[in-house]
């Protein structure tokens, strides 16, 4: 399945979650396109609810179904709660950490920065957005990329970095201190529904 490239605003309203991270999509019309008010959403089947939750998380991270499912399978091989492990693995993606550090305004921008070779891990260029970070690794902007407007503007407006990361604004680098707790990850996602979705297939 291809990565979604359509209107994030319509997709955000349909799923009831801000895919841009700004929340602007839901400010005026916090209901799905085609509805004429917030109370007209039709009742969904159990399967449809599970599918919708899966799509919410997949579109939030902007990854293909294959990448998403492979990460889900990998999470199932770890000890602990499957759904929480899955959420943590997604948060450990390099593009997700670049976004969380505030080096990009959106996850899509973060993915592009990585893919275009502007990001290093432990001093070596890594251009794979799905690269999984380990505690202690350092994510930084390549020296010749540090003056890019997209990065400078993102850092300037960002006012929050999660506690599982340690960011040095002057050096434009951040350390992946530890694996995040579930409480530090998107609260609007019910990952158990996603586990149930794949379990039923």
Swiss-Prot record:
GO CC aspect terms: small ribosomal subunit
GO molecular function, one term: rRNA binding
Intrachain S-S bonds: none
PROSITE patterns in the record: S4 (PS50889)
Cell membrane as UniProt keyword: no
Keyword Signal listed: no
A GO biological process held by the record: translation
InterPro entries for the chain: Ribosomal_uS4 (IPR022801), Ribosomal_uS4_bac-type (IPR005709), Ribosomal_uS4_N (IPR001912), S4_RNA-bd (IPR002942), S4_RNA-bd_sf (IPR036986)
Keywords noted in UniProt: Ribonucleoprotein, Ribosomal protein, RNA-binding, rRNA-binding
Domain S4 RNA-binding: 92-155
CDD domains (UniProt xref): S4 (cd00165)
Family in the record: Belongs to the universal ribosomal protein uS4 family.
Purpose: One of the primary rRNA binding proteins, it binds directly to 16S rRNA where it nucleates assembly of the body of the 30S subunit.
Subunit structure and binding partners: Part of the 30S ribosomal subunit. Contacts protein S5. The interaction surface between S4 and S5 is involved in control of translational fidelity.
Record protein name field: Small ribosomal subunit protein uS4
Organism: Staphylococcus carnosus (strain TM300)
Encoding gene, per UniProt annotation: rpsD
């Amino acid at each position: 399945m291809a990565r979604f490239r359509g209107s994030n605003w319509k997709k955000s309203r349909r799923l009831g979650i801000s895919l841009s991270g700004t929340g602007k999509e839901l400010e005026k019309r916090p209901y799905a396109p085609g509805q004429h008010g917030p109370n007209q959403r039709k009742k969904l089947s159990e399967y449809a609810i599970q599918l919708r939750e899966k799509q919410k998380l997949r579109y939030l991270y902007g990854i293909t179904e294959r990448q998403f499912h492979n990460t889900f399978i990998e999470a199932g091989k770890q000890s602990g709660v499957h759904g929480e492990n899955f959420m943590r693995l997604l948060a450990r993606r390099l593009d997700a950490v670049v976004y969380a550090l505030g080096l990009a305004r959106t996850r899509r921008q973060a993915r592009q920065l990585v893919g275009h070779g502007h990001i290093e891990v432990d001093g070596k260029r890594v251009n794979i957005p799905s690269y999984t970070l380990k505690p202690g690794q350092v994510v930084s902007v390549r020296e010749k990329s540090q003056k890019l407007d997209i990065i400078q503007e993102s850092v300037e407006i960002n006012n929050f970095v999660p506690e599982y990361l340690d960011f040095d604004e002057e050096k434009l680098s951040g350390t992946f201190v530890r694996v995040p707790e579930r409480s530090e990850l998107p609260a609007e996602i019910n990952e158990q529904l996603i586990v149930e979705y794949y379990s039923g297939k």
